[in-house]
Amino acid sequence: MAYDTNNIFAKILRGEIPCIKLFEDEHTLAFMDIMPQAEGHALVIPKEAATTLFELSDAAAAACMATVRRIGTAQKKGLGAEGIVLMQLNGEAAGQTVPHLSLIHI
C-alpha cells in the first residue's frame, strides 16, 4: 500500500476534514474516532507522511508514543479507565485500510 496524499488522515491534517482534536503538537495529532468502538476511542497520527511504522522516522515514532502516553493518561483520569488497548496495523494483510500510520486507543 503506497502513501496517498489524499487519504482521510492527510485531509484531516490539512484541515480539509474536521475532527474533534484532543491534542496537537509539531509532530502528532490526536483526535476522536468518528466510529468509536468504545467510550474514549481516539486516534493518534503522525504529521509525517508514512503509511506504516516501518516508514516512520525515529523522531516521529518517539513523538507518537509520547502522544499515545499523554492521551492514555487522560483517558485513565477522565474516563476512569483501568486500562487501554493500543492497536497499530501495518499493511493490508494486517487489516490496515487507510494509507497513513495511526495508533488506535480504545
Name what the model sees in each region.
Residues 1-104:
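HIT superfamily nucleotide-processing domains
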